[in-house]
Amino acid sequence: MFVLPGYDAFLGFLLIAAAVPVLALVTNKLLAPRSQDGERQLTYESGMEPIGGAWIQFNIRYYMFALVFVIFDVETVFLYPWAVAFHRLGLLAFIEALIFIAILVVALAYAWRKGALEWS
């Protein structure tokens, strides 16, 4: 018997969510071919002979653009439910959303002024 009776379904979903990836990994380990010859360990380059190593360093600029994208992607995730329920939330929720957007605009302006978005 579970202590919090209202959370039985949540516990069930949590157990299923933990079991599915483990089951997928175990199934893969059991059914995957075991061949480890030298050619299977090479990097795949669309059927061509691999040239050089697969480990290269990426420019840090890609990281900065990805970070800015993630920030504004998360902003969209937070603002979408607000936009759906906008008509029921009232003026206070509108002001809170404006403050949230203003903080992110200030962060974008700061990154822009510091040159984080420059590609030179």
UniProtKB/Swiss-Prot annotation:
Membrane-spanning parts: 6-26, 64-84, 89-109
Q: Name one GO cellular component term.
A: NADH dehydrogenase complex
Source domain of life:
Bacteria
Enzyme Commission identifier(s)? 7.1.1.-
Q: Does the keyword Cell membrane apply?
A: no
User: Subcellular location, in the record's words?
Assistant: Cellular thylakoid membrane
- InterPro entries for the chain: NAD(P)H_OxRDtase_bac/plastid, NADH_UbQ/plastoQ_OxRdtase_su3, NDAH_ubi_oxred_su3_sf
**The keyword Transmembrane is assigned to this record:** yes
What's the top EC group for this one? translocase
Reaction(s) this enzyme catalyzes, per UniProt: a plastoquinone + NADH + (n+1) H(+)(in) = a plastoquinol + NAD(+) + n H(+)(out); a plastoquinone + NADPH + (n+1) H(+)(in) = a plastoquinol + NADP(+) + n H(+)(out)
Q: Which GO terms describe its molecular function?
A: NADH dehydrogenase (ubiquinone) activity; quinone binding
Membrane topology is: Multi-pass membrane protein
A single Pfam family it belongs to is Oxidored_q4
Which GO biological-process labels does this protein carry?
photosynthesis, light reaction
* The entry's keywords: Membrane, NAD, NADP, Plastoquinone, Quinone, Thylakoid, Translocase, Transmembrane, Transmembrane helix, Transport
Gene3D superfamilies listed in its UniProt record: NADH:ubiquinone/plastoquinone oxidoreductase, chain 3
Assembly and oligomerization: NDH-1 can be composed of about 15 different subunits; different subcomplexes with different compositions have been identified which probably have different functions.
Protein role: NDH-1 shuttles electrons from an unknown electron donor, via FMN and iron-sulfur (Fe-S) centers, to quinones in the respiratory and/or the photosynthetic chain. The immediate electron acceptor for the enzyme in this species is believed to be plastoquinone. Couples the redox reaction to proton translocation, and thus conserves the redox energy in a proton gradient. Cyanobacterial NDH-1 also plays a role in inorganic carbon-concentration.
What family is this? Answer: Belongs to the complex I subunit 3 family.
Q: What is the designated name of this protein? A: NAD(P)H-quinone oxidoreductase subunit 3
Q: Which gene encodes it?
A: ndhC
